[in-house]
Amino acid sequence: NDVQYVMNCAAYTAVDKAEEHEDLCMRINRDAVRNLGEAAHAVGAKVIHVSTDYVFDGTSCRPYLESDATCPVSVYGRTKLAGEQALMEVCPDSVIIRTAWLYSEYGNNFMKTVLRLGKERDELRFIFDQVGTPTYAGDLAVAMLAVLERAEAGKFIPGIYHFSDEGVC
């Protein structure tokens, strides 16, 4: 077997649409993750899985710690937490990396929308009921590679880790 690691960045991430498509969201964010974990475990591979801060209720005045109790308030958050739990159940030798406000020049994300609207409109209005740290996808990729490098050095430590860039907006 040549497979040592599986990196899973796939997910149903349309947070608002998830409320209307709970079954599909659960099949992707929980069931597919469980299947991936089972397949990886069967061949002795370790899984590095990307998750989200939506597993929390978002009411903390400080950054969440890995040891904080989860309490998702949305379908998306509940399905991502269910995926974490399913993965650790079938493939406990896994790393889960929770991140927040992920953005890049690719795909759909809040930062790209703001930049596009900034070009189209003279004025932008925002609700300001959330505080968070935007995380560049490239930085998350570097963090995931660091997990692989540690694993190759014999220092793979399964568990849940939080990663985001610095700063707050």
Language model: regions and residue ranges:
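Short, intrinsically disordered, charge-balanced linker/junction segments flanking boundaries
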Residues: 1-2, 115, 166-169
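NAD(P)H-binding glycine-rich loop region in Rossmannoid oxidoreductase-like domains
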Residues: 1-30, 41
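Conserved catalytic-site loops of classical short-chain dehydrogenases/reductases
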Residues: 5-7, 45-51, 95
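Active-site loop/turn elements of alpha/beta-hydrolase fold enzymes
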Residues: 11, 52, 99
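Catalytic helix-loop patch of NAD(P)-dependent Rossmann-fold dehydrogenases
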Residues: 20, 27-35, 46, 55-97, ...
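Mid/C-terminal beta-alpha module of Rossmann-like enzyme folds, strongest
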Residues: 143, 150-169
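Conserved sequence/active-site signature of Rossmann-fold short-chain dehydrogenase/reductase
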Residues: 55, 102, 131, 166-168
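NAD(P)-dependent short-chain dehydrogenase/reductase
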Residues: 85-132, 137-146
